[in-house]
Regions:
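Basic, Lys/Arg-enriched alpha-helical interface segments
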Residues: 1-64, 73-79, 88-91
């Protein structure tokens, strides 16, 4: 099991998502628990590595327009949640 760290950017974005009421927080928590357990996400989440300057990061689609950006520190068993939001919010 990975220890989960939330960046300040992630916390701010999550707060906005909660205030919007557009998504169920339980959906986000479910995906984070799967990732933190080290299990592979189901295909429907379209989990993949990013490219270019963000190649150390991964991205998955919690919902079609809700993306989670994260990375692992495998040596210390840490999962860092970097940001969450729509494509236009993140990129």
């Amino acid at each position: 099991m990975y220890y989960v760290i939330l960046t300040s950017r992630y916390k701010k974005s999550l707060r906005k998502i909660k205030e919007s009421g557009r998504y169920y927080i339980s959906d986000i928590e479910k995906v984070v628990k799967i990732i933190a357990s080290g299990k592979k996400l189901d295909e429907k989440y379209r989990d993949h590595s990013l490219t270019g300057s963000m190649s150390e990061y991964r991205e998955c689609h919690i919902k079609s327009d809700l993306l989670l950006v994260y990375y692992f520190n495998h040596n210390e068993l840490i999962l860092v949640l970097v940001n969450i939001g729509s494509h236009s919010d993140l990129f």
